[in-house]
Amino acid sequence: MKYDNLLDRFIKYVKVNTRSDPDSETTPSTESQEAFALTILKPEMEAIGLQDVHYNPVNGYLIGTLPANNPTLTRKIGFIAHMDTADFNAENVNPQIIDNYQGGDITLGSSNYKLDPKAFPNLNNYIGQTLITTDGTTLLGADDKSGIAEIMTAIEFLTSQPQIEHCDIKVAFGPDEEIGVGADKFEVADFEVDFAYTMDGGPLGELQYETFSAAALEVTFLGRNVHPGTAKDQMINALQLAIDFHEKLPAKERPEYTDGYQGFYHLTGLTGTVEEARASYIIRDFEEASFEARKVKVENIAQSMNAQLGTKRVLVELNDQYYNMKKVIEKDMTAIELAKEVMEELAIKPVIEPIRGGTDGSKISFMGIPTPNIFAGGENMHGRFEFVSLQTMERAVDVIIGLVCKA
């Protein structure tokens, strides 16, 4: 179905810079996310008919309720999307609208960048559709402002059509998903539902209930700096220690070599001097045993290097971030079966594959609310080549409406 306000709503949202900050110690991590919640989303939620709309300054969540208008529909369903965008320029987002895409290259604004079907064959899935792209200087922010726009549009449709019967609906827009801490302070007591969905997936049909298990790894290397002219048998180069550590990890177990259910080690940052260096990694895997084995491996590498050095110069700090939500959701597949049924009735083929990433639903599922993930439309997310199809967004709205009417 077409929805009059969906595109304008999405464009309005993405023009607001809500980039999160991994180095911040506040919640939300950036003031712009709170401002976006309070000045744009909250008034709009109230205007379209959501009740008890409130912002929690402790966890950064904006929550609203649409009560059931049919007492026989007893389920309570939640929909969640995140307000922040990834670690890429989000200032002065200037979306391009490509009507009736006919294939071929899409030049991104006046930049030297283009969307090329040879580099991005997923473009070929969108012939004849309306695409929203960047101008080549920023990301788009469809991850996850497409999800926010879809939830808002579904609620607006339901409140404008009171004859359409639906169950109790809860809506939550949260912060800092992209830096892995968005759901850390989520309050289940403030979101009383039987199950929920994050609208944070990619192409049409995605329905996901398996995520990575994730850990953050920080490794500090302590060197000993002396003049290079007299360094023989004295200097210990911390940067070289970092290189040695990295080379001891399996070379083919990196993101660029893995897919499907394969896990990886990913070096995300490396800084330092001869005296001290620091390497940042993320560790990902699906199965609990292999996830734990990866963490043991880095500990063993550090221990081996320290033994060879004769002192503790490789310091490892490991922190689990989230876990594969399959462990929770497979105990009660109601949310998955309902979503599959609704999609099939809408002639959408459910694409059930693992998420090679995580969502807020991972943590929320372990808090007691099964929260699988549904497509929101974004492609090539987290960079200048991001785009989204308006038609896919419309279908996501259809799914939301179908879920609450069938509950």
Curated annotation (Swiss-Prot):
The subcellular location is: Cytoplasm
**Cofactor(s) required for function per UniProt:** Zn(2+)
Tell me which Gene3D superfamilies the record gives: 3.30.70.360, Zn peptidases (3.40.630.10)
Report the enzyme's class at the first EC level. hydrolase
Q: Write out the GO MF terms.
A: metallopeptidase activity; tripeptide aminopeptidase activity; zinc ion binding
Cofactor descriptive note: Binds 2 Zn(2+) ions per subunit.
PROSITE patterns with a match to the protein in the record: ARGE_DAPE_CPG2_1 (PS00758), ARGE_DAPE_CPG2_2 (PS00759)
Which GO annotations describe the biological process of this protein? peptide catabolic process; proteolysis
What are its E.C. numbers? Answer: 3.4.11.4
Q: Which PANTHER family match?
A: PEPTIDASE T
| The protein's name in its UniProt record | Peptidase T
Q: Which organism is it from?
A: Streptococcus pyogenes serotype M2 (strain MGAS10270)
